[in-house]
């Protein structure tokens, strides 16, 4: 079952989510839009096992990284009723 991993612009570039991911789905990429000069990216979502460790590791008040599991993916993106 595929999962979607969404990185929001509230990412502070702390790398906590990247270090928490057991399957290396996430990586940091350069980005001028935050103080750290980098932001999380999810180039390998096909490897996501849905453990949500990245969400648990995120220190921001609004989770900067969210994992949407299976059918939750289409619902959250407005593709299903």
UniProtKB/Swiss-Prot annotation:
Catalytically driven reaction(s): reduced [plastocyanin] + hnu + oxidized [2Fe-2S]-[ferredoxin] = oxidized [plastocyanin] + reduced [2Fe-2S]-[ferredoxin]
Residues where [4Fe-4S] cluster 1 binds: 11, 14, 17, 58
PROSITE patterns per the UniProt record, alphabetical: 4FE4S_FER_1, 4FE4S_FER_2
EC number: 1.97.1.12
A molecular-function term among this protein's GO annotations: oxidoreductase activity
Subcellular location: Plastid, Chloroplast thylakoid membrane
Residues that hold [4Fe-4S] cluster 2 according to the record: 21, 48, 51, 54
SUPFAM superfamilies named among the record's database cross-references: 4Fe-4S ferredoxins (SSF54862)
Cofactor(s) essential for the protein: [4Fe-4S] cluster
Highest rank taxon of the organism: Eukaryota
Described function: Apoprotein for the two 4Fe-4S centers FA and FB of photosystem I (PSI); essential for photochemical activity. FB is the terminal electron acceptor of PSI, donating electrons to ferredoxin. The C-terminus interacts with PsaA/B/D and helps assemble the protein into the PSI complex. Required for binding of PsaD and PsaE to PSI. PSI is a plastocyanin/cytochrome c6-ferredoxin oxidoreductase, converting photonic excitation into a charge separation, which transfers an electron from the donor P700 chlorophyll pair to the spectroscopically characterized acceptors A0, A1, FX, FA and FB in turn.
Subunit structure as annotated in this protein's UniProt entry: The eukaryotic PSI reaction center is composed of at least 11 subunits.
Protein name: Photosystem I iron-sulfur center
């Amino acid at each position: 079952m595929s999962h979607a991993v969404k990185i929001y612009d509230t990412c502070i570039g702390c790398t906590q989510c990247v270090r928490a991911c057991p399957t290396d789905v996430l990586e940091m990429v350069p980005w001028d839009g935050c103080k750290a000069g980098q932001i999380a990216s999810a180039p390998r979502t096909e490897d996501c096992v849905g453990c949500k460790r990245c969400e648990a590791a995120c220190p921001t008040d609004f989770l900067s990284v969210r994992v949407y599991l299976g059918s939750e993916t289409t619902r959250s993106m407005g593709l299903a009723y």
